[in-house]
C-alpha cells in the first residue's frame, strides 16, 4: 500500500456522500506497499465509530477490478476472514475518486507479525487451504497478472540494469520457468483463485486474551489475486513466512508447520510434491522481477517505499542451489 494519488479531507467527505457510513472522523494515507493509493478511514454513525480502508487503484482497470472485489465478497460469505467491500447507496462497490477506480472495504482487526511463530505459520497454512477450497465455485475468472506472460514482458526492460551473475540468473531462470510452465505436469496442477501476495504484512492476528489462543484476524490486500496454481500461492507464502531473512534458507519448523496444516485441509497431489522446488523458484522469481522493475523503473508516489530487490535474488539463488526439494509432508499411518 502507498499513496500515489492524494485525496483531501474535503474530497473524501464529498465522495462518502455516496455511502451510508457516517461522518468522517479521521483520514490518513498508508505508507507501506507499492501498488495502490490506500487510506485508513474512521467514521462515526449513530454514536459508534467504524474503521475502513479506502483504496484508489493506480494500475488495475474498471474491467479487471470486479474479479478482486467480488472474490473478497465471495470468500467473506464462505467464512474466510477478509475485508468486505462496502456498497454505496446505489449498491455499487466500485466507483471513481479523483479520476481513479476506488472502493471502500472493512478494516480487519489485529496486527501483522513480521517475526511469525511456528504456531502462526500453521494457522496461516490452515486458512490458506480453506481459502483455496472456498474459491472453487467462484464464477469469475482472471489470471494472475504477474505470472509468466508478465515476466516475459518485463524482464527485457530490467536486464540492462543488471550485470554478470545477476543477469545470468535473471535470464536462465526465465528460461527454466518457460519450460516448466509448458510442461504437461504443470498443466495438471490443481488451480483456482489465489491471493498471490500473502506476505506477513498482508495477514493480521488478534492478540491472545484471558487465556485464549491467538486468533487469525484475516487476510487482506487481494489486489494481486488471480487464478493460478494453488501450489504457487503456497510457495509465495512459504518464501516469506518460513525463511531466515538474512540467508533466504527455509526454516524447517515453520515450513513443516505451514505445509502440514495446509495438507490436513487440502492434501497435496503427487505432482505438487514433485514440483515443489520448481514452484518455490517461480515464487521467488516473480517477486525478484517485480522488485527489480519497481527499483529501476519507479513511478512517482507521495509515500512510496520500494523494496530491496536483492532479497528475492538471494532467496532464488538459495532455491536453485538447494538440491532436490520436495514437500515435507506427514507420512501415512501404518
UniProtKB/Swiss-Prot annotation:
Catalytic activity: L-homoserine + ATP = O-phospho-L-homoserine + ADP + H(+)
Keywords: Amino-acid biosynthesis, ATP-binding, Kinase, Nucleotide-binding, Threonine biosynthesis, Transferase
Entry EC number(s): 2.7.1.39
GO function terms (MF aspect): ATP binding; homoserine kinase activity
InterPro entries: Aminoglycoside_PTrfase (IPR002575), Homoserine_kinase_II (IPR005280), Kinase-like_dom_sf (IPR011009), Pseudomonas-type_ThrB (IPR050249)
Example GO BP: threonine biosynthetic process
Pathway involvement of the protein, from the record: Amino-acid biosynthesis; L-threonine biosynthesis; L-threonine from L-aspartate: step 4/5
Origin superkingdom: Bacteria
Classification via Pfam families: APH
PANTHER family, alphabetized: AMINOGLYCOSIDE PHOSPHOTRANSFERASE DOMAIN-CONTAINING PROTEIN, AMINOGLYCOSIDE PHOSPHOTRANSFERASE DOMAIN-CONTAINING PROTEIN-RELATED
Family label: Belongs to the pseudomonas-type ThrB family.
Name of the protein this chain belongs to: Homoserine kinase
